[in-house]
Amino acid sequence: MLFRSRERGFTYLLCRTSNPESAELQGLRVAGGGFPDEPLYVRVARLAAGRPEALAGRIGLVVGATAGEALRTARAVAAGLPFLVPGVGAQGGDIAAVLAAGQATAGRAASRFGGGLMINVGRGVTDAAREASDPGAALSAAAGEWCSRLAILPPDGLPPAANE
């Protein structure tokens, strides 16, 4: 795997998208390299989790919200990596299911607010402006709604480390 040679920065690797066609490539079985026969997305998660950059907290995986079983499997293989999770909102990903299947169980990501998950909502916000007489107000309202549904900060607004 190639990564930037810089010692700082962060890279998200595409692991498993949730569109139905993704299984055609990301679900291909791969074998060899001292690893078990497994789907390609699992191999990506396994290789990413074993990288020195993972221990340094500089690698995460993109795993789609509507690919529930794949999210659970990727989390089992890459327990400590942060996940960027698109597909909540217009694509129909379920927040509760993502939280149940995707929270980090080890490493730096597990100790962060949000359980190592960064849930992305795009069209769920931007689609609100399509037919609105005041697109700005519609975007603001939709963003506010999603922010309240995805809130990860404690009521005082700051993670404990920031309060210390």
Which functions belong to the PLM regions below?
Residues 5, 48-53, 73-78, 147, ...:
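Surface-exposed amphipathic alpha-helices with a cationic face
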Residues 3, 26-28, 76-78, 98-100, ...:
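Short, glycine/charged-enriched secondary-structure capping and boundary segments
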Residues 35-42, 68, 92, 133-140, ...:
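Electropositive phosphate-/nucleotide-binding environments in soluble metabolic enzymes
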Residues 5-9, 30-35, 80-83, 102-105, ...:
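Short, low-complexity, polar/charged sequence segments that are solvent-exposed and flexible
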Residues 95-107, 112, 116, 125-164:
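C-terminal helical cap(s) of enzyme catalytic domains, especially alpha/beta-barrels
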Residues 39-47, 57, 69-73, 97, ...:
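Non-catalytic alpha-helical scaffold/packing segments enriched in small hydrophobic residues
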Residues 61, 65-120, 124-128:
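A C-terminal functional module that forms or caps the active site or interfaces directly
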Residues 1-62:
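Conserved anion-binding
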